[in-house]
């Protein structure tokens, strides 16, 4: 093979190698650009504030962002949530809705409301506080987890059981046991069972369930959870009514 043919072969090989390297570099740059776009999109998406409840279900990969970033658009939205809650509960707000004393709360429930009112007006912090409270709930024996004690119409599985005891004044009071398999729902169950334990059934029946609007919790609850809360309160009041009837007999 003479020198001219050898040079020609080397030249062709050089061109092939150059083209191969060029193709690899183009693909590498394209991959980097796509990865940068994905990272940029992810950063932008994590900063989105979800104003409408329906938008939560549209984002499958970010279910926690709703609790962290959801805030009502304006005062009218917050007010409409309270109106919906009042309509569902069947209870009217007092003449002065901001007056905590008009909701006939037990001392324990009053302290809980004051705790949430002292917190920053942030759905994220308040939802985390509800979840932390749920961890304090006492375990319910399996023998009480029966159909009779189950709260129907809740998104999570919820059980409520009343224990009638005598206090120091020889009066009949109720100690509540509760259970739920949901994080937020378990916190709500704890707030109610702890706040209503140790009181007479007639005092519990006077409690206006709309007190939850004072805490700010109802502003980040979905409609299904609001219904669940009201069903829990309704179950508690049914138990109290039946206990009072048995006491009279």
Swiss-Prot record:
Q: Which UniProt keywords apply?
A: Apicoplast, Plastid
Q: Name the catalytic site residues.
A: 154 (cysteine persulfide intermediate)
Matching entries from Gene3D superfamilies are given as: 3.90.1010.10
Regarding how it is modified after translation, the entry says: Proteolytically cleaved.
For whether the record's keyword set contains Cytoplasm, the answer is no
Q: Which GO terms describe its cellular component?
A: apicoplast
The subcellular location is:
Plastid, Apicoplast
Q: What is its main location?
A: plastid
The record ties this protein, via InterPro entries, to:
Fe-S_metab-assoc_dom
Knocked-out gene: effects: Parasites require mevalonate for survival. No significant effects on apicoplast morphology.
Pathway field: Cofactor biosynthesis; iron-sulfur cluster biosynthesis
Q: Does the keyword Plastid apply?
A: yes
Which residues lie in coiled coils?
none
Q: What does the protein in this record do?
A: Participates in sulfur mobilization (SUF) pathway for iron-sulfur (Fe-S) cluster biogenesis. Enhances cysteine desulfurase activity of SufS. Probably functions as a sulfur acceptor for SufS.
Family from the record: Belongs to the SufE family.
Q: Tell me the subunit arrangement.
A: Monomer. Interacts with SufS; interaction enhances cysteine desulfurase activity of SufS.
- Record protein name field: Cysteine desulfuration protein SufE
Gene name on record?
Answer: SufE
């Amino acid at each position: 093979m003479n020198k001219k043919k050898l040079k020609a072969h080397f030249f062709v090989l050089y061109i092939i190698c150059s083209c191969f390297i060029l193709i690899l570099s183009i693909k590498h740059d394209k991959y980097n650009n796509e990865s940068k776009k994905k990272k940029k999109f992810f950063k932008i998406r994590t900063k989105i504030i979800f104003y409408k409840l329906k938008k939560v279900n549209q984002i499958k990969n970010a279910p926690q962002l709703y609790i962290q970033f959801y805030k009502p658009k304006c005062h009218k939205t917050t007010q409409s949530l309270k109106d919906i809650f009042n309509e569902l509960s069947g209870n009217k707000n007092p003449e002065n809705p901001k007056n905590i004393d008009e909701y006939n709360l037990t001392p324990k429930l009053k302290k809980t409301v004051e705790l949430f009112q002292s917190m920053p007006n942030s759905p994220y912090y308040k939802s985390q506080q509800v979840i932390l409270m749920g961890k304090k709930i006492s375990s319910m024996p399996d023998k009480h987890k029966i159909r009779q004690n189950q709260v129907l119409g809740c998104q999570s599985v919820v059980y409520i059981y009343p224990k009638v005891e005598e206090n120091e004044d020889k009066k009949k009071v109720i100690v509540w046991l509760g259970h739920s398999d949901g994080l937020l729902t378990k916190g709500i169950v704890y707030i109610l069972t702890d706040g209503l334990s140790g009181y007479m059934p007639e005092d519990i029946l006077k409690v206006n369930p709309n007190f939850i609007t004072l805490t700010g919790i109802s502003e980040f609850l979905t409609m299904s959870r609001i219904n669940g809360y009201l069903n829990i309160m309704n179950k508690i009041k049914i138990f109290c009514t039946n206990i009072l009837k048995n006491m009279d007999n």
